[in-house]
């Protein structure tokens, strides 16, 4: 049944795309002999993912001398969440950026990247672990088995909890109705703090906050500003518990259809984008926080000492237990790999200081 629904979604999308671009063929030439590549992502215009996609578009069109056009589709234009993954898997879109929660619906082990306090507080350490570590190489294999090829793993910033009351300890979160992505692991993790985690579609989060249907939500700073969540919240709680990870993927069938020159071009561009998105998300986090404070000076920021954060880390173990119960030996192997990758990256980065 799921496969039938996915195929219906793909056919519908192909018709929509055909209406927009004049072609239903993945790399068909237009009347001007221009190939069209389709790029779908999960965020709104102006977001980190959108900036990544638009920079990719700019570089592809520049380096191909205009022989390739990249059409970018932000969240909701073709599909949301799991639907976007199916479009990529069936080659209805050629590139996509996915988050760990949606991919976890077909690759449970991918929830590794959502475990609380698994990553370093140092973004450079995390970047090195994601780019050079063994855990993402193993995840690459699992993605490929599901008809997705990861080209880049990147950070979009730490998740920040917003609320209408200060959160100093896990006890302060008792009964806290927090919007989370539809992930069983996230539900288990936030439940361990005493929360009432509630999955709500991203584009409906503001109205749910405004109508007091939920008490708070969790997202990177840029998203909190971009979606105006701060307008209906009073506190930003910087727990540094979770890094939001984006995965830039392509479709295997599409990839094999490319010439060697096109493959080389894409790989060179993704290397350039790795530095671009790292610098950009750091800049976005700072600029968007400043914008929030300028627009709402009354909002309060709560930061934590290592001792205060330790109380949350202790509770976070429930998320690890859930993950390992779900994924077994494969999950344990991946967790060990990621922890080793981060430790090695930490050592290497600190040596360079």
Q: Across the structure, where does each feature detected by a protein language model lie?
A:
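N-terminal secretory/targeting leader peptides
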Residues: 21-125, 141-145, 149-353
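C-terminal motif of bacterial Sec signal peptides marking the signal peptidase cleavage site
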Residues: 15-19
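Positively charged n-region of N-terminal signal peptides that target proteins for export
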Residues: 1-4
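Repetitive helical segments and hydrophobic/amphipathic motifs
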Residues: 11-12
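Signature of the catalytic double-stranded beta-helix
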Residues: 127-138
């Amino acid at each position: 049944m799921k496969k039938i629904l996915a195929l219906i979604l793909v056919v519908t999308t192909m018709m929509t795309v055909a209406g927009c671009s004049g072609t239903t063929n993945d790399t068909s030439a237009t009347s001007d002999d221009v190939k069209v590549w389709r790029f779908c992502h999960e965020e709104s215009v102006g977001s980190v993912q959108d900036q990544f996609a638009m920079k990719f578009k700019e570089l592809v069109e520049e380096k191909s001398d205009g022989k390739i056009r990249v059409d970018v589709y932000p969240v909701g234009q073709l599909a949301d969440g799991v639907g976007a993954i199916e479009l990529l898997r069936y080659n209805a879109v050629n590139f996509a950026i996915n988050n760990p929660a949606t991919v976890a619906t077909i690759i449970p082990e991918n929830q590794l990247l959502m475990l609380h306090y698994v990553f370093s507080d140092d973004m450079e350490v995390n970047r090195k672990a994601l780019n050079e570590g063994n855990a993402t190489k193993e995840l690459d294999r699992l993605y490929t088995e599901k008809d997705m090829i990861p080209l880049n793993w990147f950070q979009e910033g730490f998740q920040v909890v917003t609320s209408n009351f200060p959160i100093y300890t896990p006890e302060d979160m008792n009964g806290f109705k927090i919007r989370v992505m539809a992930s069983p692991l996230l539900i288990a993790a936030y439940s361990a703090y005493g929360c009432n985690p509630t999955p709500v579609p991203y584009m409906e989060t503001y109205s749910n906050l405004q109508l007091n249907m939920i008490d708070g939500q969790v997202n990177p700073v840029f998203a909190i500003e971009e979606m105006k969540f701060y307008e209906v919240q009073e506190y930003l709680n910087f727990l540094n518990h979770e890094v939001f990870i984006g995965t830039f993927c392509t479709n295997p069938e599409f990839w094999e259809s490319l010439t060697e020159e096109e493959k080389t071009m894409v790989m060179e561009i993704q290397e350039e984008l790795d530095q671009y998105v790292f610098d950009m998300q750091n800049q976005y986090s700072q600029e968007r926080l400043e914008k929030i404070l300028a627009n709402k000076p009354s909002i309060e920021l709560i930061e934590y000492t290592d001792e205060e954060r330790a109380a949350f880390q202790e509770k976070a173990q429930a998320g690890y237990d859930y993950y390992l119960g779900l994924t077994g030996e494969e999950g344990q192997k991946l967790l060990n790999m990621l922890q080793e990758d981060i430790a090695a990256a930490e050592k290497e980065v600190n040596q360079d200081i």
